[in-house]
């Protein structure tokens, strides 16, 4: 395959050499592609638009030994709303980063392409953070890391309670009885029953129905943090843009009146704080 066409999204774009950009593309047919767009940083470059983050375009690529080369590009969608709102932009950046870290070049994932493409549109009509969390849970589920949110990941009993331990190592929530059993207590983060219920809806529900869901500031912060923790621990990679976005979420107060930050700590299964 010397020259080939690919309809792809730009999920990462960075400077390369004096006037080039190194693009990470994600296509339905070929999965992730690393390609050099030569000369696109020059003001008069005709391919400049096709090297912008989140651009969806038809690319004519030349196959190389380690990096492909962009020969031609025909932009189709630029998602302009992502550049007019900080929350939308941060959510889109977080989703693109997760997709990049969770996939390898040359492995097609048509379902993930559809999920990503749809989610970039959806942030305009839904709470961007809600779309971001849904995206993370569905992506991890597709890759085979479906978190257990209904039954205890250790014993299989249906979980109940106002606060439960979410443990990526165990594969989901862990009931109170299993938290301290064995020589190695479960490690994770506490999640409220309300947030856990919403996470179930995000994982199982359809993207088109997301705008029907509502959450408060406490649930938003909690689910964003738990989703990031789940992805990072499972993939063993750091999500930098998620950390930046989470810091922008205003912290409210939980129903008990305690400060949220005092309640958001890792635990070792021996106690709640």
From Swiss-Prot:
Composition bias, Basic and acidic residues: 257-273
**Gene3D superfamilies, per this entry?**
Nucleic acid-binding proteins, Recombination protein O, C-terminal domain
Record keywords, A-Z: DNA damage, DNA recombination, DNA repair
This protein's record includes keyword Amino-acid biosynthesis = no
User: Which residue ranges does the record annotate as region Disordered?
Assistant: 250-273
Entries under SUPFAM superfamilies matching the protein: ArfGap/RecO-like zinc finger (SSF57863), Nucleic acid-binding proteins (SSF50249)
Please give an example of a GO cellular component term from this record.
Answer: bacterial nucleoid
* Record GO biological process: DNA recombination; double-strand break repair
HAMAP family in the record, alphabetically? Answer: RecO
Family membership noted in the UniProt record? Belongs to the RecO family.
What does this protein's UniProt record list under function? Involved in DNA repair and RecF pathway recombination.
Q: State the protein's name.
A: DNA repair protein RecO
Gene from which this protein is expressed: recO
């Amino acid at each position: 395959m010397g020259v080939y066409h690919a309809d792809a999204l730009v999920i990462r774009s960075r400077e390369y050499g004096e006037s080039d950009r190194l693009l990470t593309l994600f296509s339905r047919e070929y999965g992730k592609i690393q390609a050099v767009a030569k000369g696109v940083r020059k003001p008069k470059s005709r391919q400049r638009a096709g090297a912008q983050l989140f651009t969806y375009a038809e690319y004519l690529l030349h196959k190389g030994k380690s990096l492909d080369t962009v020969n031609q590009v025909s932009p189709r969608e630029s998602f302009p709303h992502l550049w007019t709102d900080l929350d939308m932009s941060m959510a889109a950046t977080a989703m693109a980063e997760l997709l990049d870290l969770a996939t390898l070049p040359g492995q097609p994932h048509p379902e993930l392409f559809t999920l990503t493409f749809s989610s970039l549109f959806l942030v305009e009509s839904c709470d961007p953070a809600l779309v971001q969390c849904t995206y993370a849970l569905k992506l991890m589920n597709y890759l085979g890391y479906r978190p257990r949110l209904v039954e205890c990941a250790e014993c299989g009993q249906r979980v109940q309670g106002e606060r439960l331990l979410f443990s990526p190592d165990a594969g989901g929530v862990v009931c109170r009885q299993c938290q301290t059993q064995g020589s190695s207590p479960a490690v994770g983060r506490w999640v409220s029953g309300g947030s856990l219920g919403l996470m179930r809806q995000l994982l199982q529900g359809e993207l088109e129905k997301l705008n029907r869901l509502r959450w408060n500031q406490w649930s938003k912060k909690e689910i964003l943090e738990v989703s990031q923790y789940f992805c990072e621990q499972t993939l063993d990679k750091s999500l930098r843009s998620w950390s930046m976005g989470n810091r922008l979420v205003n912290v409210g107060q939980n129903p008990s009146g305690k400060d949220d930050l005092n309640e958001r700590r890792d635990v070792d299964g021996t106690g709640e704080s």
